[in-house]
UniProtKB/Swiss-Prot annotation:
Coiled-coil blocks: none
Species this protein is from: Pyrococcus furiosus (strain ATCC 43587 / DSM 3638 / JCM 8422 / Vc1)
GO terms for biological process, alphabetical: glycine decarboxylation via glycine cleavage system; nucleoside metabolic process
Enzyme Commission no: 1.4.4.2
Protein name: Probable glycine dehydrogenase (decarboxylating) subunit 1
Length: 448
């Protein structure tokens, strides 16, 4: 196959002449000779040859259908209806263009408006932005927002120690520059927020955070009481939620949340190595809250002819206003992921959302029951997706055995929480088959 050089020799000579050089070597004469080496790349290939080589490489991958995974801990295998992918691949949606010109972007803007409306209905708070980067970035922005709401007079944000470790890292990165102290609350003997410890640490806090479910997969039984403790201390109540549970539990807004964050990509997106994602961010319909909300909102208005129209509004981002006055330095969002989530949620409807939550609860309960036959379940309670399991043997050995059996085991927890010993989180979703769980237990019996 012949080579085609870009730019070609004539163009190269013309450019060199324009800048006063006779050769490429003269242009880069300042580069030490030791750093100049042969451009050692293989010969070019035809499209068919590239196709065959890539196909051979890709054939080494194993999907979750060929190798069932119980990994969980934030990334889950959910079924995405085929029409979701078809719709978001339309050129109106699949574009790098930001819809600044509302007059030519009504389709995208309305889709994002529908996303906001659906999330508002699910989380029980009326004001939703058009998404953040992910759950972690939404949490970081929520913490900073609580400080702004207190006009910088409170510089403490209280979180459960058992918040997802990676989400905790993002939170600390976000808040370090703002000198915001992250205070961790212990868990009790049931793996839930220790209310007495919370009461001791909540004074002078800007905000208090809790998750539904928590990192151990447990539903916190005292969400409303945690919110009351926060409000009594003058702190704002921030709730992080996995939205796939919202068809079977009360909305966080109904439980007293001032701000709700979460992960929208559980709807409409594959696991895809953990990304891209879309962070949920919702708050109360109060001018004080709305003005401090990060990101941007898609609003509905009327055009010059009195027809319904959608526009980007309240864009308090550094791209549009002075950096010192901006509520966030996020200059974009995850629009395509948010649209995919909206299509998926709308396709499910209220009944589908309820059925989704019920099936996940049922599969998680079966997984927990079977795991309890071969290992210790440290915490009692209702689990959603994740189940914490403690083993007597080193978990890495157990995991290697599972891989040999073509099963991907749980998420190793000990590096983050040494006090939990040889523990791992095993997860189930609506896609988890009974025979997968049974095969997992059989494999565990062999190694334990």
């Amino acid at each position: 196959m012949g080579k085609h050089y870009i730019p070609n020799s004539a163009h190269k000579e013309e450019m060199l002449k324009e800048i006063g050089f006779s050769s490429i070597e003269e242009l880069f004469a300042d580069v030490p000779e030791g750093f100049i080496r042969e451009f050692n790349v293989p010969e070019g290939k035809s499209e068919y040859e590239v196709f065959m080589e890539m196909n051979e490489i890709l054939s080494k991958n194993k999907t979750v259908l060929e190798m069932p995974t119980f990994l969980g801990a934030g990334t889950y295998f959910h079924y995405v209806p085929a029409h979701v992918k078809y719709l978001i691949e339309r050129s109106e949606f699949l574009t790098s263009y930001t819809p600044y010109q509302a007059e030519i972007s009504q389709g995208m803007l309305q889709a994002l408006f529908e996303y906001q409306s659906l999330i508002a209905e699910l989380v029980g708070l009326p004001v939703v932005n058009s998404s953040m980067y992910d759950w972690g970035s939404a949490l970081g922005e929520a913490a900073l927002m609580t400080v702004r709401l207190h006009r910088g007079k409170r510089l403490k944000f209280v979180v459960p120690k058992h918040t997802h470790p990676e989400r905790m890292q993002v939170l600390k990165t976000y808040t370090r520059g703002a000198n915001l102290e992250i205070v961790e609350v212990k868990w009790n003997d049931r793996g839930q927020v220790d209310l007495e410890d919370l009461k001791e640490k909540v004074n002078d806090a800007a905000g208090v955070y809790v998750e539904i479910p928590n990192f151990f997969g447990l539903l916190e039984e005292n969400i409303q009481e945690i919110g009351e403790i926060a409000h009594e201390a003058g702190a704002y109540f921030v709730v992080g939620v996995d939205p796939t549970i919202l068809g079977v539990v009360e909305a966080p807004g109904e439980l007293g949340a001032d701000i709700v964050v979460g992960e929208a990509s559980y709807f409409g997106s594959p696991m895809n190595f953990g990304g891209p994602r879309a962070g949920i961010f919702a708050t109360r319909n109060d001018p004080k809250f709305i003005r401090q909300m990060p990101g941007r909102i898609i609003g509905m208005t009327k055009d010059a002819e009195g027809k319904r129209a959608f526009v980007m509004t309240l864009q308090t981002r550094e791209q549009h206003i002075r950096r010192a006055k901006a509520t966030s330095n996020i200059c974009s969002n995850e629009a395509l992921v948010a649209v995919a989530a909206a299509i998926h949620i709308a396709s499910l409807g209220p009944k589908g959302m309820q059925e989704l939550g019920e099936v996940i609860l049922k599969n998680t309960a079966y997984l927990k029951k079977r795991l309890s036959e071969v290992a210790e379940i440290p915490f009692d309670g209702v689990n959603f997706k994740d189940v914490l399991v403690k083993f007597e043997k080193p978990y890495q050995e157990i995991h290697e055995h599972l891989l040999q059996k073509n099963i991907h085991g749980g998420y190793y927890v000990k590096p983050h929480f040494p006090e939990l010993g040889e523990s791992a989180l095993f997860a189930a979703t609506e896609t988890t088959r009974k025979e997968w769980i049974d095969a997992l237990i059989d494999a565990l019996r062999e190694v334990l």
